[in-house]
Amino acid sequence: MDGLTAHLAPSHTRQDKYEMTEPPYRLQINQDQLVTIIEGRTKILVPKGAMEDKVPPRDIAFFNPRARLSRDFSIIAYSAFLKDLERPKIFLDGLSGLGARGLRVANEISDIQVFVNDANPKALDLSRESAELNGLKNYHISENEVCRFLSAFSSEGNRGTIVDIDPFGSPSKYIECCLRATSHGGLLSVSATDLQVLHGLFNDACKKKYHGTPIKTTYSNEIAIRLILGMIVTVAARLDLEATPIFVETNQHYYRVYLRILHKPDTRNLIGFIQHCRDCGNRCAVVESAAKCKLCGSEQQTAGPLWVGTLYEKEFLTSMLAELPKYTIDKKCEKTLRKTILESDMPACYYTLDEIAEALKTSPLSLQRIIERLEQNGFAASPTSLNPTGFRTNCPIDKIKELFAQ
C-alpha cells in the first residue's frame, strides 16, 4: 500500500468531491484491551496500556490523557477561526496518533472535512473505529510519511484551512511541509515537547532545530515559545509567507502555538533577541542586541534569535472566549483566555513574585497587590497565562522593586 493517494477536486464544495484511498483495516487488538473515553462530545477508543506510558510505545498506539486541555483549546481556537469563513473548511493532521484531535474536530465543528495521517497502522485502525463509533462521515484516514501526506495538499485550491502538527519532540523538520499545505489566510497549529532542548540543556541541538539558543531565567517558557515562533516565522519568510502568532498556550509537558498564514512576503522585522541582566534583573526584547544593560551597565545574557513580536491577537482571543459556551470544555480554558486578553498588549518577558522577593530578601506580595501598586503609580500591569505567579508590566525593574518593598 502506497499510503495517501488523495486529492481535492478543483471545485470541492460538496462532500462527495473528496477522494481518498484509505489503508486497509487490520485491527488486531483485543477489545478487552480497549477503553472508551469521552472528551468534549466525542468518544475515543484507547488502549488501556497506552494511557499509562510516558513515551509513545512502538507496539500499541499512544494516547496522552494529560493533553486534553490542549485539545480543548484547539477546539475553541479552530471554532473561532472558522466562525465567519465561507470557503470550504479542510483540517489536516499530519501526526494524528489515535486521532483524538481530528476526531473531535470532525465531530464537534460543523461543515468541515478532516484528513488525518499517521505511520502507525494500529493507531489508524483505532482511529477508524472511533470515527465509526461517532458516526463520522467527514473523517478520512491516510497512512504515510508526514511530508508525503501534506504534499498532496500543497497546490493552489487544495490546501488545508487548518494544518496541525503534534510530534513527540521537535516540530522543526515538518514546518516547511506544513506551511506549504496551509492555505492563504489559513491557520497553522504546532506543538513542541522537547522542553530540555528549549530550556537550554542542549544548546547545539536548539540552534539546529530552532535557529537560536535560550538562556535560563524565571520566564524560560516564554523564551522557549518565542524560539518556536521565531523558527516558524523564519521558515515561512523563506517561502515568501507571512506567519503571525495569534495564540499560544503551555503546561509543564508541551508548548503549543497558533499562527495565521498569509501568502505574501514578510516585510516585518520582528526576529531579534531577549536580553537579561543577572545583576539588576532588567529584561527586554530587542531587534538589535547590546552588550551592556541600559539600566546598570552590567554584561547581559542574550537569547535568540527569536520572535520579539506579540504572542496574541486580542480580537482572536475575544472570539475564542465567545465560543466557550458552545462546547464541553475544561473550565481552565476560560481562566487562561481571560489572562491572555489582559496581557496581549503588554511587553515581552514577564516577572515573577518569587524572583522579586528573592532579590529584595523579603516575602512575596500577592499578585493582585503588586498589580494594584503598579497601576496606581501610572504603569500598565497584568497577570500572565504563562505562570500563575507571573506578571507583565512596562515598569522598570528598579521601580518594581521600590513598589514591591513599600
Residue ranges and their predicted role:
Residues 1-406:
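SAM-dependent transferase fold signal centered on methyltransferase-like domains
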